[in-house]
Amino acid sequence: MDDLKSIIGKVATGASLSRDEAASAFDAMMSGEATPSQMGGLLMALRVRGETVDEITGAVAAMRSKMLTVTAPPDAVDIVGTGGDGSGSVNVSTCASFIVSGAGVPVAKHGNRALSSRSGAADVLASLGVRIDLRPEQVGRCVRECGIGFMFAPAHHPAMKNVGPTRVELATRTIFNLLGPLSNPAGVKRQMVGVFSRQWVQPLAQVLKNLGSESAWVVHGSDGLDEITLTGPTFVSSLHNGEIRNFEVTPEEAGLPRCEPGALKGGDADANAIALQSVLNGKPSAYRDVALMNAAAALVVAGRAKDLKEGVALGAKSLDSGAANARLKHLIAVSNG
């Protein structure tokens, strides 16, 4: 506790924490050793000053050390967003996950219920009939047998219950909004992470590099989406072979048409589930296109596609052959088995 007091005192001066100091502070918070006042003070001091790459790296390391892990193949990927983009869009990363799985790449999907939108990954999967409250070994079985499994964040990060009330009372974004997507319980080394603000694109790629990721894209749409968008360019920071590159991608690069922002608007969980099922059934739409765009990027990250155009072709084959839909049906069966 004295360590935590000195760390809070350091942050109060505007100084940055080392990776180890951040890990120690967040370990104390998630272990229930910190008081609500200490947690609130530290979180807001970091937020106002702006969290550094080392602070986020240490915080993620602490969160990962406390999570309930899942065994997944070494080539598994995750497609995940921070949420909090305020767009109320359809569930892009969830749909893209089935497309990627149908293309032969195992997916260990990490997600939660809606935080700021009307429908998060967990909400839409539950509406589709997938059982989401599985034990880690059951999720591992889904990934092995179905090529896709869903890890419901609260079930795998029980230590988060110690910071939950403080986060609710603060009612504003904190570093915790960034930690979840970087703390995949299956320990995947290949990720596509969407973020709610352009300012976090490159820093989070650096955090993933620090924590041993092999291949990753961190993305933010120019329209504010925490996905690759089709309304205009998307800002990307990619990690490959230990190098980070920053660039933009456009729908045209992938051979896809642009769409109006309203075309990606979603509804509640049931409405979004119906829309997702229609994509998996092969129906053309802007939703299909944006899901293909994001799946294509994940296939590039996974090393299955050399570029977005090839990724879109592989994704379209996954949809049109029925493979992606078969993955959903299999996941519903195994998760409820």
From Swiss-Prot:
Gene Ontology BP terms: L-tryptophan biosynthetic process
Binding site for 5-phospho-alpha-D-ribose 1-diphosphate: 81, 84-85, 89, 91-94, 109-117, 121
Binding site for Mg(2+) 1: S93, E227
Catalytic reactions of this protein: N-(5-phospho-beta-D-ribosyl)anthranilate + diphosphate = 5-phospho-alpha-D-ribose 1-diphosphate + anthranilate
Binding of anthranilate 2, residues: R167
GO cellular component: a single term: cytosol
EC number(s) recorded for this UniProt protein: 2.4.2.18
Residues spanning the membrane: none
InterPro entries membership: Anthranilate_Pribosyl_Tfrase (IPR005940), Glycosyl_Trfase_fam3 (IPR000312), Glycosyl_Trfase_fam3_N_dom (IPR017459), Glycosyl_Trfase_fam3_N_dom_sf (IPR036320), Nuc_phospho_transferase (IPR035902)
Binding of anthranilate 1, residues: G81, N112
Keywords on record: Amino-acid biosynthesis, Aromatic amino acid biosynthesis, Glycosyltransferase, Magnesium, Metal-binding, Transferase, Tryptophan biosynthesis
Pathway: Amino-acid biosynthesis; L-tryptophan biosynthesis; L-tryptophan from chorismate: step 2/5
Cofactor note: Binds 2 magnesium ions per monomer.
Needed co-factor(s): Mg(2+)
Binding site for Mg(2+) 2: D226, E227
GO molecular function (one): magnesium ion binding
Family per record: Belongs to the anthranilate phosphoribosyltransferase family.
Function: Catalyzes the transfer of the phosphoribosyl group of 5-phosphorylribose-1-pyrophosphate (PRPP) to anthranilate to yield N-(5'-phosphoribosyl)-anthranilate (PRA).
NCBIfam families for this protein: trpD
Assembly notes: Homodimer.
Name used for this protein in its record: Anthranilate phosphoribosyltransferase
